[in-house]
Amino acid sequence: MSHKIMAINAGSSSLKFQLLAMPEGEILCQGIIERIGLADARLVVKTATEKWQEITPVADHREAVTLLLEQLINRKIINSLHDIDATGHRVAHGGETFKDSALVTDDVMAEIERLAELAPLHNPVNLLGINIFRQLLPSAPTIAVFDTAFHQTLEMPAYIYPLPWRYYHELGIRRYGFHGTSHKYVSGKLAEKLGVPLSALRVVCCHLGNGSSVCAIKGGKSVNTSMGFTPQSGVMMGTRSGDIDPSILPWIALREGKTPQELNQLLNNESGLLGVSGVSPDFRDIEQAAENGNQQAQLALALFAERIRATIGSYVLQMGGLDALIFTGGIGENSARARAAICNNLHFLGLSIDADKNQHNATFIQSEQAMVKVAVINTNEELMIARDVMRIALPEPALQEVLA
């Protein structure tokens, strides 16, 4: 039996969505409502055969969801709201409470709200989206899918920071990790393509986009990941610095009189590829500038690759070897130059890539003599969300082995 599942990612001024037929995974429609709260908000909807957009005032998220549901009916994508069997919502932070996706209840909503102090920019609006869909689709189960849940398998030495113990015990300061839904999806897809159980593999997954993270996966479980207490930490990103010497911050504060809020702005929005290159946070713009001889752009690309290489190396050491390296995300899936730079001179790990396969974005780009598989896999977080919805909200025994 096929079910219609809506996957939702609610942002501060946007609402991304996919309606999928499950368990087939067929996308019935997908799109975004952006500039919510403004008179010129934009709705974009795509199906397999057509695409349309509409510019219209959208006062708030409730109006956005109402507009979306009306469009689905008016365009005959669904006959009525009862056609939507369940909804799945990306939630940025599940803390230590949620080790898996969860059926939303009043208690679950209260806990997501409590955890908003760990993700003040994301959890409140994620919760808002959940609440609106629960009100407008009261008969459809709602599932919260947490970006942090996949990393709850980290052992304590991998997630504790060397700070006074009370900061963890009383305030919950620890490594949480993010991009978990993506890392979970692509590692499972890798095992499927190889015809090998994920439990038998040691994998490093590089989710590289405007936000980037690296994850070590052993036996199908996350054992380390580069993002930490916040998505700001780890490797260099589009506008985020990643890991730096923490004493730089009080030094800058004293030297330039910056407030904590200004320091946060510096680290999150003015650093990374943008900060070093002075060109753009967009990897394509930096690659073009580097090809045109811009030395700062060239340095930014080199630094980006070097930080990722160092992280890969530490994870290989932790896992005692490597069976496969995955590239995913906007940069990982599309930049042959980035993949080549990251894989350069890793022959000692049994890892080398075929230049032609890499240039043409083949699924497997390792050279014939390589011992380590190198895969380029398009992430699909919406499908992973829909699978979790099916597993938790609409369990059918015959499907559980497929969806596991």
Curated annotation (Swiss-Prot):
Pfam families from the UniProt entry: Acetate_kinase (PF00871)
HAMAP family according to UniProt: Acetate_kinase (MF_00020), Propion_kin_subfam2 (MF_01882)
NCBIfam families reported in the protein's UniProt record: ackA (TIGR00016), PRK12397.1 (NF009063)
Uppermost EC category: transferase
Protein name (Swiss-Prot/TrEMBL): Propionate kinase
PROSITE patterns noted in UniProt: ACETATE_KINASE_1, ACETATE_KINASE_2
Pathway membership: Polyol metabolism; 1,2-propanediol degradation
Keywords, comma-separated and alphabetical: ATP-binding, Cytoplasm, Kinase, Nucleotide-binding, Transferase
An example Gene Ontology CC term for this record: cytoplasm
InterPro entries cross-referenced by the UniProt entry: Ac/propionate_kinase (IPR004372), Aliphatic_acid_kin_short-chain (IPR000890), Aliphatic_acid_kinase_CS (IPR023865), ATPase_NBD (IPR043129), Propionate_kinase_PduW (IPR024896)
Reactions this protein catalyses: propanoate + ATP = propanoyl phosphate + ADP
Source organism of the structure: Escherichia fergusonii (strain ATCC 35469 / DSM 13698 / CCUG 18766 / IAM 14443 / JCM 21226 / LMG 7866 / NBRC 102419 / NCTC 12128 / CDC 0568-73)
